[in-house]
C-alpha cells in the first residue's frame, strides 16, 4: 500500500448558524475510516466549535458538540487551534472543551488532542499536508 | 414507512431504521431483529446496549472500526474483534446492531 | 425601530453597519451567530460597548446557550432575553429591520 496521505481539515465557521461545522465534522468522521493521517485546524469563528457547555435544547436543534469528543476514538487526535483567533474572540484554552484520546500502546493513557498554535506554526503545518479541505 | 406493535406505531426510514430515536423500546428491537430472522440473545443485547450508551454520550453511531475497538476495551479482546461481531450481526455489526438499537445508520456507512 | 443582527461580527460587517446607522431610540437584538457580538474581551467589544451608551442592545438567551456562552462572558449592559422578550421587542417597536 502507498503511504498514508496527510489530510488537514480546516474549520472556519461557528457551530450553529450554518451547516459548515456539522458537515465538516461528518466528513472527518467518514474520512477517518480510510486510515489516513488526519488532523484538524480551527481558525477564525471555527474556534467557537470547541466552546464548552453548548446546549441547543431551547433552540430545537440537535447538539452535535459531544461528537467532537469521539474524534479520539476515530484516531483523529491532533486538533490545532489558532491562538490569534482565540485572542481576537476573547477566548482562552480554558473556554474550550477538553478533548482527549487514549493511547492503546501506553495502557490507554489519556492524552490531550488540543494544540494551541500561532499563525506561523499553522502555516508550517499546512505546508506539510498532502490534502487540505476547508469547511 | 412504519410498523405497528401493541397498538404503538413506529415510524421508520426506507431501510427500516427508526425515524425517531425516542420511540425505541426493547419490543421494537426484538421485532426488528425477528424481521431479519435474528433472535436476540444476551450477547446481542450487550452490543445493542453498548451502542445506545455510546450514542447517548457522543450523539453519533460509531463506525465499525471504532465499535470493535471500544467493545474490546469494555468487554475483552475475545469480543472486540470483527469475527465475533460479524457472527452476531451477519449484515454488518455497526449497521445491523444500530438498527436494533434504534440509532441512525453509522456515520460513514453506505 | 428594532434591529436584529444574525451574523457573527467576525464574519460579516452587518453588526458594525447596523450600529453606525441605529438611532438613539433603537433596540438592537443579537440572534443566532449575531450573539458572538455580545462577547466581552473580543476585538469587537469596544464597538458594541460604545453603542450601548446610545442604543439598547439585547442578546437572545437560547442562542447564547446553544453556543456555550454564559452571561458572565457578555459585555455589561447587554440585556439577555428569551423568545418571549423577542416578541415583546417586536411588538413594542413600530418597525423591524433584519440585518441579514
Which residue stretches match the model-derived regions?
Chain C
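Conserved acidic residues
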Residues: 1, 26, 94
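Short, glycine-rich nucleotide/cofactor-binding loops
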Residues: 1-15, 34-40
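Structural motif
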Residues: 5-8, 62, 100
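Short, glycine/charged-enriched secondary-structure capping and boundary segments
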Residues: 17-20, 42-45, 73-75
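Short, conserved loop/helix-junction motifs that constitute active-site signature segments
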Residues: 20-24, 47-54
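Short internal beta-strands
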Residues: 27-32, 55-63
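N-terminal beta-loop-helix "entrance" segment that forms/cooperates
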Residues: 35-49, 69
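C-terminal structural segments of small proteins and small subunits
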Residues: 67-100
Amino acid at each position: 500500500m502507498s503511504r498514508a496521505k496527510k489530510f488537514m481539515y480546516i474549520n472556519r465557521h461557528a457551530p450553529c448558524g450554518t451547516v459548515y461545522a456539522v458537515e465538516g465534522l461528518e466528513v472527518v468522521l467518514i474520512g477517518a475510516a480510510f486510515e489516513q493521517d488526519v488532523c484538524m485546524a480551527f481558525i477564525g469563528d471555527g474556534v467557537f466549535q470547541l466552546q464548552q457547555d453548548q446546549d441547543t435544547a431551547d433552540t430545537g436543534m440537535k447538539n452535535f458538540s459531544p461528537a467532537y469528543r469521539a474524534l479520539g476514538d476515530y484516531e483523529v487526535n491532533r486538533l490545532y487551534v489558532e491562538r490569534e483567533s482565540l485572542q481576537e474572540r476573547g477566548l482562552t484554552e480554558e473556554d474550550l472543551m477538553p478533548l482527549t484520546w487514549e493511547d492503546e500502546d501506553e495502557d490507554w493513557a489519556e492524552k490531550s488532542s488540543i494544540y494551541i498554535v500561532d499563525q506561523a506554526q499553522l502555516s508550517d503545518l499546512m505546508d506539510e499536508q498532502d490534502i487540505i479541505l476547508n469547511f | 414507512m412504519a410498523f405497528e406493535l401493541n397498538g404503538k406505531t413506529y415510524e421508520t426510514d426506507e431501510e427500516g431504521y427508526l425515524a425517531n430515536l425516542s420511540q425505541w423500546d426493547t419490543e421494537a428491537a426484538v421485532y426488528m431483529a425477528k424481521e431479519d430472522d435474528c433472535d436476540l440473545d444476551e450477547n446481542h443485547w450487550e452490543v445493542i446496549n453498548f451502542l445506545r450508551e455510546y450514542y447517548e454520550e457522543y450523539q453519533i453511531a460509531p463506525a465499525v472500526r471504532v465499535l470493535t475497538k471500544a467493545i474490546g476495551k469494555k468487554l475483552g479482546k475475545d469480543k472486540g474483534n470483527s469475527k465475533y461481531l460479524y457472527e452476531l450481526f451477519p449484515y454488518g455489526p455497526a449497521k445491523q446492531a444500530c438498527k436494533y438499537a434504534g440509532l441512525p445508520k453509522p456515520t460513514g456507512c453506505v | 425601530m428594532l434591529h436584529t443582527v444574525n451574523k457573527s461580527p467576525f464574519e460579516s460587517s452587518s453588526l458594525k453597519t447596523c450600529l453606525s446607522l441605529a438611532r438613539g431610540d433603537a433596540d438592537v437584538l443579537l440572534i443566532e451567530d449575531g450573539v458572538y457580538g455580545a462577547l466581552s474581551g473580543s476585538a469587537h467589544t469596544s464597538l458594541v460597548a460604545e453603542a450601548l451608551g446610545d442604543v439598547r442592545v439585547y442578546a437572545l438567551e437560547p442562542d447564547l446557550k446553544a453556543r456555550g456562552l454564559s452571561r458572565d462572558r457578555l459585555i455589561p449592559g447587554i440585556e439577555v432575553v428569551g423568545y418571549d422578550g423577542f416578541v415583546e421587542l417586536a411588538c413594542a417597536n413600530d418597525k423591524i429591520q433584519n440585518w441579514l
